[in-house]
UniProtKB/Swiss-Prot annotation:
Lineage start: Eukaryota, Viridiplantae, Streptophyta, Embryophyta, Tracheophyta
GO molecular function, one term: water channel activity
One CC-aspect GO term: membrane
Source organism of the structure: Oryza sativa subsp. japonica (Rice)
Function: Aquaporins facilitate the transport of water and small neutral solutes across cell membranes. May be involved in transport from the vacuolar compartment to the cytoplasm.
Protein's UniProt name: Probable aquaporin TIP4-1
Name of encoding gene: TIP4-1
UniProt keyword Transmembrane helix present: yes
């Protein structure tokens, strides 16, 4: 991913590598959201808001999401880092591993990609209902918020442990392991908070449908959980005496 960088490096404005990275985030996030939303549509959106999705259908969505995340992070790792997710970008910004300028471009690209993917899906499916992240029946806003914080925390913790930490024994498998935690969290939290873990993944469907109910949860939760995971991992689990910088792959 990246060593510490100057958060205000304006030289990236004319950096061809930065442009390629932003375009990669646009393409990768588009495919990720397209796959995830399409899989959810194929599984069947419950007619009653907040109704639980059958476990078999939820497992299918989790598998599709996990495979997409693992493959796409691997594909984009050496170009943009394969963030696909504003929570990842903001977590790395908070710990000084990406510039503020590049992170802003990444988030803009991720949101644009998600919006385009969902709008295109509405056209390709003949106007089928686009699934929007919502709270499960009986789940209140604070419960949903805490759920999203925990799920995103676990996601970023795995990213740090398997990709960022130079001591990782399986760095090449880090993106695939990241996909596995995304799938596991989807099953664990899908029927409670929706298991977004990704503001961009929630933004596109909300924009395409105009349904913004509790949308703030899918921003605030991941943007708390992600940076918190970075703080905890770097403070407690990254061995300082080794003097090893975080893996530098222009993340």
């Amino acid at each position: 991913m990246a060593k510490e960088v100057d958060p205000c490096d304006h030289g990236e404005v004319v950096d061809a590598g930065c442009v390629r990275a932003v375009l990669a985030e646009l393409v990768l996030t588009f495919v990720f959201v397209f796959t995830g939303v399409a899989a959810t549509m194929a599984a069947g959106v419950p007619e009653v808001a907040g109704a639980a999705m059958p476990m078999a259908a939820l497992a299918g969505v989790a598998i599709a999401t996990a495979l997409a995340a693992g493959v796409l992070v691997t594909a984009g790792f050496h170009v943009s880092g394969g963030h696909l997710n504003p929570a990842v970008t903001v977590a790395l910004l908070a710990r000084g591993h990406i510039t503020a300028f590049r992170s802003a471009l990444y988030v803009a690209a991720q949101l644009l990609a998600s919006s385009l993917a969902c709008i295109l899906l509405r056209y390709l499916t003949g106007g089928m209902a686009t699934p929007v992240h919502t709270l499960g029946s009986g789940i209140g806003p604070m419960q949903g918020l805490v759920m999203e914080i925990i799920l995103t925390f676990s996601l970023l913790f795995v990213v740090y442990a398997t990709i960022l930490d130079p001591r990782s024994s399986v760095p090449g498998f880090g993106p695939l392991l990241t996909g596995l935690i995304v799938g596991a969290n989807t099953i664990a939290g899908g029927n409670f908070s929706g298991a977004s873990m990704n503001p961009a993944r929630s933004f596109g469907p909300a924009l395409a449908t105009g349904v913004w109910t509790h949308h703030w949860i899918y921003w605030l939760g991941p943007l708390i959980g992600g940076p918190l995971a970075g703080l905890v991992y770097e403070s407690l689990f990254l061995v300082k005496r080794t003097h090893e910088p975080l893996l530098d792959n222009s993340f």
